[in-house]
A protein has these predicted regions:
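Acidic/histidine-rich catalytic cores of soluble enzymes
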Residues: 28-29, 61, 130-187
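Active-site cleft segment of glycoside hydrolase catalytic domains centered on the general acid/base Glu
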Residues: 117-134
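Active-site groove signature of glycoside hydrolases
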Residues: 98-122, 143-145, 152
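Short, solvent-exposed loop/turn segments at secondary-structure boundaries
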Residues: 40-42, 86, 121-126, 184-187
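A short acidic, helix-capping loop that chelates divalent metal ions and anchors anionic groups
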Residues: 69-71, 81, 116-122, 181-184
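Active-site-proximal loop/turn and secondary-structure-junction residues that shape catalytic pockets
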Residues: 9-11, 33-35, 64-67, 114-118, ...
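N-terminal pre-domain/capping segments
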Residues: 1-103, 107, 141, 168
Length: 187
């Protein structure tokens, strides 16, 4: 298994960050972006060239989304991912744009936090989130990619049920074990 690290598209120069990945002995990285204005063809081409220069494979594009995000149990379910209805459509569009950016980067994986998935499968909230995720998953599939859920904010049973209910063959997990501990849902 190859080990890598995450490179954020912010702050210090990207060339320095990608060179450090190589100099630290890693062969792969995830590129992470929370600012949709940076998802340009020029940025993708530059990152791809830098990764080729420093022999670093982009394993996944980690796509953030706009709007508020509070990483706790009180406000997290109201602000994170595709769960809050008031941010859902804009974030769906941002994830689709992120998929297009990832395609230009040459990676077959796009990951994000999809939010605190509703536990009650018969609820309207659950059905709406599944429909939104399915819409994004189809776009990602059309780009020849896998759509990876960064997990931890939901129980494993809910995660599996959601993936099965979406029903596309291009879904997976971007496992961050720290989230399992942080959110206490690793039952």
């Amino acid at each position: 298994m190859k080990l890598g690290t995450m490179v954020h598209m912010r702050g210090a120069d990207l060339e320095d960050k990608i060179r450090q990945v190589h100099e630290n002995g890693f062969e792969t990285c995830q590129i992470c972006c929370w600012n949709g204005a940076w998802l340009t063809d020029e940025a993708a081409d530059r990152i791809r060239t830098l990764c080729e220069t420093y022999q670093v494979e982009i394993s996944t594009f980690w796509c953030g989304w706009s709007g508020p995000g509070v990483w706790d149990f009180a406000e997290g379910p109201l602000t994170l991912g595709l769960v809050p209805p008031e941010y859902r459509f804009a974030r769906m569009e941002e994830l689709k744009r992120g998929s297009d950016f990832a395609k230009r980067l040459g990676t077959g994986n796009i990951a994000t936090h999809v939010g605190f998935l509703p536990e009650v499968s018969g609820s309207g909230e659950y059905r709406a989130v599944v429909a939104a995720l399915k819409h994004v998953a189809h776009h990602v599939k059309a780009n020849g990619q896998y759509f990876l859920f960064e997990t931890g904010q939901e129980t494993p049973v809910t995660l599996l049920r959601t993936i099965e209910d979406i029903g596309t063959d291009n879904l997976g997990i971007n496992l961050d074990p720290a989230n399992l501990i942080l959110y206490g849902k690793a039952n």
